[in-house]
Amino acid sequence: MPLLSLSWLGLGHTAASPWLLLLLVGASCLLAYILPQVYAVFENSRRLRRFPQPPPRNWLFGHLGLIQSSEEGLLYIQSLSRTFRDVCCWWVGPWHPVIRIFHPAFIKPVILAPASVAPKDRVFYRFLRPWLGDGLLLSTGDKWSRHRRMLTPAFHFNILKPYVKIFNDSTNIMHAKWQRLASQGSARLDMFEHISLMTLDSLQKCVFSFDSNCQEKPSEYITAILELSALVARRHQSLLLHVDLFYHLTRDGMRFRKACRLVHDFTDAVIRERRCTLPDQGGDDALKAKAKAKTLDFIDVLLLSKDEHGEALSDEDIRAEADTFMFGGHDTTASGLSWILYNLAKHPEYQERCRQEVRELLRDREPEEIEWDDLAQLPFLTMCIKESLRLHPPATAISRCCTQDIMLPDGRVIPKGVICRISIFGTHHNPAVWPDPEVYNPFRFDADNGKGRSPLAFIPFSAGPRNCIGQTFAMSEMKVALALTLLRFRVLPDDKEPRRKPELILRAEGGLWLRVEPLSAGAH
């Protein structure tokens, strides 16, 4: 083989061939990696020209930064759903397209696709992984499918039914605190603060059978969960903090790791203790025995769960699912219930009708307690809850990453590799889907008015194969807490209108403040 002279690089004739070969191999590998990427970008750009897009900031940033986590950001999303009605294309920088979807007909092929075709996008959810591990929220593929099958029995009504007593007790504790604070007539309260503690109180009892009395005194575990949620939301707002190496060096990163350790240690200790005390018998017999003795908690069900091959969950898997349930169950329910009270405070006529419905249901009942069978006997209260979840959905959007082309109903195609942003908020506020979408009108959810409406027009708990497994739990808790609250208190709006703030869930800047007035015993 003839040698090429590379003496100008300081290499002799004997070294020239190997260096040239190495250079050629390296360049070929680089081109083999880059060229398909470049081709995919240009091919996707060509195919995405069929999707309209709002005016970008500029060619470099695209639409990056146009939607902030603020009231103005939500108003911008509303304007997108009014303008485009179904979908639009959004560019994050010059290379990364996102398809935003606002219409049930266009949501359907994405959200109902198999989990392998449209898995959750990991860009944002990865911030939760050190805390939640491979639980249902973050796992994919066969592991997600296996866990989903194994966890479904944990949300059967036979398991949920005894939890209603816990919901009553936790709500009673919150109300006793409100009565003390309103002893002089009325109290101005941040609903998120009080209701978050109430939902966490219920969850600790339902998941771990542990009573931390967190509504009355500080709890390290509860404080850690609240801090983790706040830290993840704050990290999402800063692009610089998206870099793991940098984030771990910051004060927030150190606080995040410390809070994770505390939460994991608590969950691990409960699992170890329960492993020691769990009866060594068949799953069904153990479930029946524990059901007779006390309320089955989430850990019990996870420890007794077996897949179709008779394999149980590992302790690591159980911890991930328990931590996921604590995360997913407290914030979303607290957001939903807080905004429901806000909407009923703004519409006293609906509030009073709900109150009368509850009074009629509990007439002459002592003590005043909501039971499982009562939950189906509150139709108007349920309509008010659903309308609030439409107007103020706890989760404003969900993301999916297409692993293959997805055909939309009008023939357009979302290319493989493109992220889809399903806008729950935009769909719920789309005038093409909901007439007068900014008006709070519970009668939208009257059975007669819902005829002909797509089930995907209302998706506060998502939909499809990856919908919220705990939605019956959440709805039951909201019904109990709302019914008892309206029975005992009149809820009034604050002087200052709240500014909405979408983070992990839909919050209000500076808290969601309302006034509560205890109702006299005679008013009952």
Curated annotation (Swiss-Prot):
Its cofactor is heme. Heme binds at residue 468. GO terms for molecular function: arachidonate monooxygenase activity; heme binding; iron ion binding; leukotriene-B4 20-monooxygenase activity; long-chain fatty acid omega-1 hydroxylase activity; long-chain fatty acid omega-hydroxylase activity; very long-chain fatty acid omega-hydroxylase activity. The keyword Hydrolase does not apply. Keywords: Endoplasmic reticulum, Heme, Iron, Lipid metabolism, Membrane, Metal-binding, Microsome, Monooxygenase, Oxidoreductase, Transmembrane, Transmembrane helix. It is found in: Endoplasmic reticulum membrane; Microsome membrane. Pathway: Lipid metabolism; leukotriene B4 degradation. One of its GO terms (biological process) is leukotriene B4 catabolic process. GO terms for cellular component: endoplasmic reticulum membrane. It is a single-pass membrane protein. The chain crosses the membrane at residues 15-35. It catalyses: leukotriene B4 + reduced [NADPH--hemoprotein reductase] + O2 = 18-hydroxy-leukotriene B4 + oxidized [NADPH--hemoprotein reductase] + H2O + H(+); leukotriene B4 + reduced [NADPH--hemoprotein reductase] + O2 = 19-hydroxy-leukotriene B4 + oxidized [NADPH--hemoprotein reductase] + H2O + H(+). InterPro entries: Cyt_P450 (IPR001128), Cyt_P450_CS (IPR017972), Cyt_P450_E_grp-I (IPR002401), Cyt_P450_sf (IPR036396), Cytochrome_P450_Monoox (IPR050196). Gene3D superfamilies: Cytochrome P450 (1.10.630.10). The keyword Heme applies. Belongs to the cytochrome P450 family. A cytochrome P450 monooxygenase involved in the metabolism of the pro-inflammatory lipid mediator leukotriene B4 (LTB4). Hydroxylates at the omega-1 and omega-2 positions LTB4. This oxidation step leads to LTB4 inactivation, which is postulated to be a crucial part of the resolution of inflammation. Mechanistically, uses molecular oxygen inserting one oxygen atom into a substrate, and reducing the second into a water molecule, with two electrons provided by NADPH via cytochrome P450 reductase (CPR; NADPH-ferrihemoprotein reductase). This is Cytochrome P450 4F3. The lineage of its organism: Eukaryota, Metazoa, Chordata, Craniata, Vertebrata.
